[in-house]
Regions:
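Bacterial Sec-dependent N-terminal signal peptides
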Residues: 1-49, 718-721
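Compositionally biased linear targeting/interaction segments
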Residues: 27, 45-237, 243-254, 258, ...
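Residue-level recognition of beta-strand termini and adjacent short loop/turns
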Residues: 96, 107-110, 137-140, 220, ...
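Short helix/loop capping segments that flank catalytic or ligand/cofactor-binding pockets
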Residues: 190, 273-275, 327, 336-339, ...
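Surface-exposed loop/turn segments flanking beta-strands in extracellular/periplasmic regions
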Residues: 284-295, 340-358, 408, 643-648
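Aromatic- and glycine-enriched pocket-lining scaffold segments that form the walls
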Residues: 308-356, 365-367, 371-375
């Protein structure tokens, strides 16, 4: 409008003036006006405020493409951390390199380019300037915009506080949040009917309601503490050792600004390197694994409701100005385990976190687990080394019944593992790896080589070998098998941006299992996974994507009382188109699946779905989802992301014939209070019951309602970051 006003004044002046201008002068004025118009438009384009996509679009674009029947592990704590960061975005002009490196979709070159640009320009004027950062492609910009904001001045050395606060201030001057969610099923499962002859396994002790309460406190990145209580559906309340709920989890984190130490008390997570000792430092996504970023050992609070994968105790980190860092922790937990009849030996671990039947309650916290670890690292800009050791002692011997596939599984009371990880950064290359050895000398190793020949292209290769007898109880690397052992493989990945707003990415993963597995009774079975995705964005409001996935794996086949192996192959194709405006967004998606076996079995499945969101006002928003699916059987099942309440995540598998719908309403009657309601309905056309055994529903309908209340106390002046 301002430019239009200026141009109009110039034209009126020229028309009213008696001065005669030459044709050459008129051309110059015309060129000036055109260039001014282009410049103003560029400035307004750069000053685009707000994220380029919503949280739901990020989950559907980045996470859900990697979730299928393969069962890749999605770290719930990291997913929840990303969701909370999306709700409280980092200030891009004050965030540090460590903050940006925590995002799994960014590589170090992109982070360095962003920081260099910020230093030269004395800060970002808006998120639109991300398009001027070298190496920052369209989708990286969109993903990052979900978690950062631009509403503060640039500070050269990071955040500086003019007020000296005591530790007590860190623990009291921040923001408080209380959240409660109640899930109500509008149906009845078989397990809630007490049979005439009750036993320890044929009915649920509690009611069908699921309830979770969360309390969270945070003071920027410097302090945090929280408490989580959860009751799963079917679990009792205030009886049989539940006070009042089954699951309690709390944590305290203190990491004062400009201090070189941090401390964690209570429940915490450990992530390190490539995951041969502890969980991998990021999501276990093969497409993202090609980014080639080394993430050293880190502690983080356990904030999710996952009742199995965490430590409980004390963790401490201390770093020096010369790049040295020391980490140490000690943990003690009571695990769910199935014991022998005399109770002196554990036979298996129960990791579902469910305690609904008497037999599940009997297994609750029956095995003590003491874990300690120490590590030292030297991290420089061009290279780094890290040495970590972990010791675990069970209170009772662990010995699972012998089967053909578990002869090399852990047995005993004590396990000890040590790992050495490294990274090297030659020009245009990124090399990292990890070697781990257990107390018996069995080795596992994983190495990654990435090469970037321009900001538009990146290729990577990863090689792994896990000894069949290697034991690491907390390892979680990227693999096709269910544990970090008995596997060798190679992964090749590619990421290419041929033209602006177009991205092609994919990988090929080959694996061989040295010893028999649960699914393949013959040694040296093989598996191949392939993935190819193309994404195109014509503008900031419309995107088109296509993804193809191939999964081929050998399984046991019994022919004439003789065991052999057969390949079972699954092809999946997904096409999606998304529209996004300031107050609404919509995604139309089509999925297809073809499942075949070597003996001639063939199954087909397809699904069409629509997901949308609408911000009616600043206080009311509506999200919806509807899908129609037809599959021949469960092996041709398909997946789709549905709108979820905050801090909840699940991937719905669609099989057989039916329709599914979800409606989610969020209302803020006052600034600090948010009320949310989620209703879902699933209808099968070719079934008169759903699920089996104690979870059986004697109906073709499955309807659920969830209510969530969230109250947030705003941060005080000195609690902002």
């Amino acid at each position: 409008m301002f430019l239009f006003f200026v141009c109009r004044m110039i034209v009126l002046f020229l028309c009213s003036s008696n001065t005669k201008l030459s044709k050459k002068s008129m051309k110059r004025i015309f060129v000036i006006i055109v260039w001014a118009w282009l410049g103003i438009n560029a400035i307004y384009a750069q000053r685009f405020e707000g994220p380029f996509m919503s949280w739901d679009e990020f989950v559907a674009s980045y996470l859900d493409n990697e979730v299928d029947d393969e069962g890749l592990f999605i770290d719930e704590d990291m997913r929840e951390w990303l969701e909370r960061t999306a709700e409280h975005p980092l200030q891009i002009n004050r965030t540090t390199k460590a903050d940006l490196m925590a995002f799994p979709f960014l590589n170090e070159q992109q982070v360095d380019s962003l920081l260099v640009y910020r230093a030269k320009r004395r800060g970002f004027g808006s998120l639109g300037e991300l398009q001027l950062v070298s190496g920052m492609d369209y989708y990286s910009r969109c993903f990052l915009s979900v978690f950062v904001r631009c509403d503060s001045a640039y500070v050269e050395d990071g955040y500086k506080s003019d007020i000296r606060l005591r530790i007590s201030d860190f623990l009291s001057e921040g923001s408080h949040e209380v959240e409660s969610r109640l899930d109500v099923p509008l149906y009845k499962r078989k397990g809630y009917d007490v049979p005439a002859k009750p036993s320890a396994t044929n009915y649920y002790v509690g009611n069908p309601l699921h309830h979770i309460v969360r309390y969270r406190y945070r003071y920027g990145k410097e302090a945090a503490y929280g408490l989580t209580m959860e009751k799963d559906a079917g679990e009792p309340v205030a009886k049989r050792g539940f006070y009042p709920y089954d699951y309690w989890s709390g944590y305290v984190m203190l990491r004062p600004f400009k201090k070189r130490w941090s401390i964690f008390l209570g429940d915490f997570q450990i992530r390190a390197a490539n995951g041969l000792l502890y969980g991998k430092g990021g999501f276990l996504l093969r497409a993202a694994n090609g980014i080639g970023t080394y993430r050293p050992l880190t502690f983080s609070p356990h904030t999710s409701s996952d009742e199995s994968h965490y430590f409980r105790g004390l963790a401490y980190s201390q770093s020096t100005a010369k790049g040295w860092k020391i980490n140490a922790f000690v943990s003690h937990r009571r695990l769910d385990a199935r014991l022998t009849s005399n109770g002196d030996t554990a036979q298996s671990l129960q990791q579902t976190g469910l305690h609904r039947t008497l037999s599940e309650i009997e297994m609750r916290r029956s095995l003590g687990s003491f874990t300690s670890g120490v590590g030292v690292s030297m991290l420089r800009s061009k290279w780094g080394l890290e040495l970590n050791e972990c010791l675990n002692v069970y209170s009772k011997p662990y010995s699972s019944p012998h089967r053909y596939y578990n002869e090399d599984y852990f047995r005993g009371r004590t396990s000890s593992t040590m790992s050495l990880s490294y990274y090297v950064r030659p020009k245009n290359f990124f090399i990292n790896g990890e070697c781990a050895v257990d107390k018996r000398g069995y080795l596992s190793t994983l190495h990654h080589v990435g090469y970037t020949w321009s900001h538009r292209s990146h290729v990577a290769m990863e090689m792994r070998y896990f000894s069949p007898k290697y034991v690491s109880l907390y390892a979680s690397p990227l693999q096709q098998g269910s544990r970090a052992a008995n596997e060798m493989g190679v992964t090749m990945s590619l990421r290419y941006v041929p033209v602006r707003n177009v991205e092609v990415s994919g990988y090929v993963d080959w694996a061989e299992f040295i010893r028999p597995t649960f699914q393949a009774a013959i040694p040296h079975s093989k598996g191949v996974n392939c993935f190819l995705q193309t994404q195109y964005a014509s503008s900031s409001s419309w995107t088109l994507s296509m993804a193809y996935r191939l999964r081929s794996k050998q399984y046991t086949l019994n022919l004439d009382e003789k065991k052999t192996l057969e390949y079972r192959i699954t092809h999946k194709l997904r096409m999606a188109s998304s529209w996004s405006k300031k107050r609404w967004n919509a995604t139309v998606q089509a999925d297809a699946c073809l499942y075949t076996t070597q003996i001639g079995e063939r199954q087909v499945g397809w699904m069409c779905s629509v997901r949308s969101g609408w911000s009616v006002s600043s206080k009311l928003s509506v999200k919806g989802f509807v899908a129609c699916f037809f599959t021949d059987d469960y092996d041709s099942r398909l997946y789709a992301y549905q709108p979820q309440l905050p801090r909840s995540y699940s991937m719905q598998a669609f099989a057989d014939h039916g329709v599914d719908g979800v409606v989610l309403l969020s209302w803020c009657p006052v600034e600090k209070l948010t009320l949310s309601l989620r209703a879902s309905s699933l209808k099968y056309f070719n079934r008169d019951s759903i699920s089996s055994r104690l979870d059986r529903i004697s109906s073709s309908w499955k309807n659920d309602v969830s209510v969530q209340v969230r109250w947030v106390m705003k941060e005080r002046k000195h609690g902002k970051y």
